[in-house]
Amino acid sequence: AEIGERPLTFCYPFNSYNEDVRRIVSENRIGTRIKQYAIGGEKSKSTVESLDKWVKELMISNDWGVTMIHGISTGYDAFTSPDILWEHFRRVKNQEYDIWVGTFREVAAYVKERRNVQLDIVKKESQWAVIPRLLLDKELFNEPLTMVLNKKGKGKVKVYQNGKRLLVKKTG
């Protein structure tokens, strides 16, 4: 039955899938959830400290995480106190300069784009041009990517996208 727009992401019922199912479900989708971190109460035994540890491990490994929550104050594996979740959110928010919080769709698209982007590097007289190429479907994959350039010397860096000059952020 046609029920509306086709979802661009998918999480497997009961976290159950195999490679054949994954291949079929992934077709024309940005991403499917194949990993998650269960948080909650009786089953997951989440504490503010355990959630801090999880976030720290993600940051050290330069990875991303998806939580799986079934109940906050009631329901399956509900938190022993909802304050645990709210405190976790506050702590993540306090690190927003170092942590990007996005929807599953945004993060899955960014990761896939980052893995698939190709850079063409061309020398033009005294300048270098770095031209990114992405062969993914532009309707599905349009998250802005970040490029880090390690530059030595006094030369200036100018960045253009579609003929428009972009702001360059210098760090360090």
Q: Which residues make up each language-model segment?
A:
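Short, well-ordered beta-strand segments enriched in hydrophobic/aromatic residues
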Residues: 119, 126-137
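Catalytic cores of secreted or luminal carbohydrate-active enzymes
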Residues: 59, 78-116
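Surface-exposed beta-strand/loop patches in extracellular or lumenal glycoproteins
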Residues: 133-155
